[in-house]
Swiss-Prot record:
Disulfide bonds: none annotated. Its main location: cytoplasm. It comes from the Bacteria. Pfam families: QueF. InterPro entries: GTP-CH-I_C/QueF, NADPH_dep_7-cyano-7-deazaG_red, QueF, QueF_type1. The active site is at C56, D63. One of its GO terms (biological process) is queuosine biosynthetic process. Keywords: Cytoplasm, NADP, Oxidoreductase, Queuosine biosynthesis. This is NADPH-dependent 7-cyano-7-deazaguanine reductase. Optimum pH is 7.5. The gene is queF. It catalyses: 7-aminomethyl-7-carbaguanine + 2 NADP(+) = 7-cyano-7-deazaguanine + 2 NADPH + 3 H(+). Gene3D superfamilies: 3.30.1130.10.
C-alpha cells in the first residue's frame, strides 16, 4: 500500500514545522481529521495525554491530569497535533473534571463520528482526593452501543492505587 498523497493531507493545517501558535482559550475548532484508510476493520486508536491542564471553575487553581482517549474510527481519524493543541486550549478553561472529559468526548464525536469512543481523565489529587471521570459512547443501534454499555459497567472493576501519581 502506498503512503498518503499530498491531496489527502491538504486539510491538515497544523501538522508540520510552521510556527505553532498555542491557544490558551478553549477552542474545539482546532481539531482536524483525516480519512481512515482502513474502514473495513475495527481497530482501536489510543492517545495518552499526560500534560493536560485546566482550571477549577470556582477557585481558578490549576488542575492536572493524564487524559486517555481510545476510539474505533469509522471514516475519519483525529490528527494528533491538532488534538494536542486542542487539549492545550483547556489551559485557561474553568470547568469541573467531569465536564472536561465529557466536553472532550463530545467534540471528538462531532468531528470524527467514530464507531466507539471513551475518554478517561486521571487527575492528580487536590485536597487529598483524586477524581478520575470516565465517559464513553457507542454509535446507537450498532454493536458499539452495547460495547459502550458493557465497558462502562466494567471499566474500573480493579481500581488502581493512587500512589502511582
Amino acid at each position: 500500500m502506498a503512503g498518503r498523497k499530498e491531496e489527502e493531507l491538504k486539510d491538515l493545517t497544523l501538522l508540520g514545522n510552521q510556527g505553532t501558535t498555542y491557544s490558551f482559550t478553549y477552542n474545539p475548532n482546532l481539531l482536524e481529521v483525516f480519512d481512515n484508510k482502513h474502514p473495513d476493520r475495527d481497530y482501536f486508536v489510543k492517545f495518552n495525554c499526560p500534560e493536560f491542564t485546566t482550571l477549577c471553575p470556582k477557585t481558578g487553581q490549576p488542575d492536572f491530569a493524564t487524559i486517555y482517549i481510545s476510539y474505533i474510527p469509522d471514516k475519519k481519524c483525529v490528527e494528533s497535533k491538532s488534538l494536542k493543541l486542542y487539549l492545550f486550549s483547556f489551559r485557561n478553561h474553568g470547568d469541573f473534571h467531569e465536564d472536561c472529559v465529557n466536553i472532550i468526548m463530545n467534540d471528538l464525536i462531532k468531528v470524527m463520528e467514530p464507531r466507539y469512543i471513551e475518554v478517561w481523565g486521571k487527575f492528580t489529587p487536590r485536597g487529598g482526593i483524586s477524581i478520575d471521570p470516565y465517559c464513553n459512547w457507542g454509535r446507537p443501534g450498532t454493536k458499539y452501543e452495547k460495547m459502550a454499555e458493557y465497558r462502562l459497567l466494567n471499566h474500573d472493576l480493579y481500581p488502581e492505587k493512587v500512589d502511582n501519581r
